[in-house]
Design a protein with these regions (language model features):
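Helix-start (N-cap) detector for alpha-helical repeat units in TPR-like alpha-solenoids
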Residues: 24-25, 58-59, 92-93, 126-127, ...
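Register position in tetratricopeptide repeats
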Residues: 2, 36-37, 70, 104-105, ...
Length: 614
């Protein structure tokens, strides 16, 4: 884990757990690896298993508390930090995390008690003073927050985050001169946080320094190109100076990035009015009214647009609704939500540590240099692989071939005694392997297989038997002539003994699916025949489930994936595909659990899907 190869780490912990399932540490460390991959359901199961084996481990409570925080189960997180502190009462990290968890629960007094306890031990810690200021901001005590941030700046004058926090706090208190000076100090110290430029841009805007505001917003966009607030603020500023087309571009981008922020549509409506886009104005105001039915300016803007469209009746309806609401001003002002259509202040720059890194460092103590096996997976499996986009597609069928890619990372048991016995008999020119992905052939290899087809054809013409016909079928399949491969299997199966019939029917089913016009009914019959002759042939259940998915027969597909897993509890592909099927029919909890298991068993692509679907 020191080298951030979390997928490979999980495989090693799997091996330890198989050998010594009574140990608590492998479950904890596997949980930590899953935390790095943001598989919090899987990590939670492992933490629970660790604590079942050793309920006196503060690290396990710490890790589980972190997981609960990510799942926003704040009370459970606090309970775990209480347990961790019971065994390690002086631990700084545990206290800080409990304070933050209490703040999330709006238990501000209790959170400040934890922080003050730390300040007694470390009165000159800028980090702890900053945390105190942050909790005070959450409790709307800006004076106490300002005092705490000033203390932080006293002890750490070169940290841009401290000056950012001071700047935001003063901006909230409408002390713009102080805020401007502090935000500029943060930027001068090398701040890479877009919020500093956003907030200083707001001050420029209030001072009518539009050139300065635009310069700061441009820099904020460069630093954080997917931040909706930056585009929104720049759009408002551009509207102010009459640059309506570019204002529209910014507001469109802001709403694309944050479609749930309906309040942004009001400013876009104002720009649309200037651009004479009357229908778009009405559409935006309707969306805004649906979210904020007591926001009167939306009714009046929609009425103006209707008037411009010549729809006087529609304009009257909007004005009448607004006038009716005017009579309920007291009700509106006493509790009805109103959108904020002003410039948006960026929150204080977070100073939180990435505790996932801390977990990883803890777990990787005493690790040695990477072995040859570890280096093998460098490019694909290291780091935050959950951030790498993966298509939402099933794992492919498992077939038999002479050629296969290395799949040693996966824990699926790519073995069946019938196939092993066939390989040992040397009835075929080479050994068959189970695979989900066959190797591409070079031109030289293709020529070799054509010559093999010619050689086998001469032997079959002389003395046809099941082994020769099946061998030629495999050669046809290798060069992708699946129709000829299926024909040879059909001739071979009537001559074959029971064991060879199992293998031939399985291969024929796989190849039928690859034909240009697959016959799924015959394919399913072949898989059923394999299952009838050899009920423990897990790959037949799995492939049949894949066919059922293509036919949108989700429940039967799930049933067959489950049967495949019953015969191989480490069948990674079956867990993965069953997980996607559950998610497709809306059973996300079961689906995420299966994807977590698939990731644990080596299908690292599952972690990106867990991140997207959780």
């Amino acid at each position: 884990m020191y080298f951030e190869d979390y997928v490979l780490s999980i495989q090693y912990f799997n091996q330890v757990i198989r050998l010594k399932p009574y140990l608590s540490e492998p479950y904890l460390y596997r949980s930590i690896a899953k935390i790095q991959l943001e598989d919090y359901q899987g990590a939670l199961k492992d933490c629970n298993a660790s604590l079942e084996r050793n309920p006196f481990s503060p690290g396990s409570y710490y890790a589980r508390g972190y997981i609960y925080r990510q799942l926003e189960r704040w009370e459970d997180a606090e309970n775990d930090y209480n347990e961790a502190l019971r065994f390690s009462p002086e631990n700084r990290t545990y206290l800080l995390l409990r304070a933050d968890t209490r703040a999330q629960r709006k238990l501000y007094t209790a959170a400040l008690e934890d922080i003050d306890q730390l300040l007694k031990r470390e009165p000159q810690s800028a980090t702890i003073w900053s945390e105190r200021g942050r909790v005070c901001i959450l409790s709307h005590d800006t004076l106490q927050a300002l005092e705490a941030f000033n203390q932080a700046a006293t002890y750490d004058k070169t940290n841009p985050a401290v000056w950012s926090q001071l700047g935001v706090t003063n901006l909230m208190m409408q002390r713009e001169d102080e805020a401007y000076s502090q935000l500029s100090q943060a930027i001068q110290l090398g701040s890479k946080w877009a919020g500093d430029y956003i907030n200083r841009g707001i001050i420029h805007y209030h001072r009518h320094n539009y050139r300065g505001a635009l310069s700061d917003y441009d820099q904020a966009v460069r630093l954080s190109p997917n931040d909706a607030d930056t585009y929104y603020n720049r759009g408002v500023m551009r509207q102010e100076v009459g640059d309506y087309n570019r204002a529209m571009e910014d507001l469109d981008k802001a709403i694309d990035l944050a479609p749930e922020r309906t309040e942004m549509r009001y400013q876009r409506g104002l720009v649309e009015m200037q651009l004479k886009q009357w229908k778009e104005v009405v559409s935006d105001m309707q969306a805004l009214i649906a979210r904020y039915p007591y926001f009167l300016p939306a009714y009046y803007l929609a009425a103006q647009a209707k008037t411009k469209m010549g729809d006087q009746a529609g304009a009257y309806r909007y004005r009448k609704q607004a006038q009716d609401l005017e009579e309920k001003k007291e009700q509106i002002q006493s509790g009805q939500a109103q959108p904020n259509t002003d410039l948006i202040v960026a929150d204080a720059q977070p100073q939180k540590k990435d505790h996932r890194k801390e977990f990883s460092a803890h777990a990787a103590q005493n690790q040695q240099e990477p072995t040859e096996d570890e280096q093998k997976y460098d490019s694909q499996t290291r780091g935050s692989i959950q951030k790498r986009y993966q298509d939402v597609v099933n794992e492919p069928n498992i077939s038999l071939s002479y050629y296969s890619h290395d799949m040693s990372l996966r824990r699926t048991n790519y073995y069946h005694p019938i196939v092993d016995q066939l390989n040992r008999s040397e009835a075929l020119p080479a050994s068959l392997r189970f695979t989900t992905q066959e190797m591409s052939l070079t031109a030289q290899m293709v020529d070799f297989h054509f010559s093999e087809i010619n050689r086998l054809t001469q032997l079959i013409d002389a003395t046809p038997d099941a082994a020769l016909l099946f061998a030629r079928a495999i050669e046809f399949a290798v060069i992708k002539d699946y129709a000829s491969a299926v024909d040879d299997c059909t001739r071979a199966v009537v001559m074959a003994d029971r064991d060879m019939e199992v293998v031939i029917c399985f291969c024929r089913a796989c190849w039928r699916e690859r034909m240009s016009e697959p016959d799924y009914e015959l394919t399913l019959r072949d898989y059923d025949q394999v299952i009838r002759l050899q009920p423990d042939f897990a790959f037949a259940y799995y492939n049949k489930a894949n066919v059922l998915c293509t036919q949108r027969n989700w429940r039967d597909a799930i049933d067959h994936y489950t049967k495949a897993i019953a015969h191989d509890s480490d069948f990674a592909e079956a867990y993965f595909n069953r997980g996607l099927t559950y998610i497709y029919i809306g059973e996300n909890e079961k689906g995420l659990s299966d994807l977590s298991k698939a990731g644990e068993l080596g299908i690292y692509q599952a972690y990106n899907l867990i991140l997207r679907f959780k």
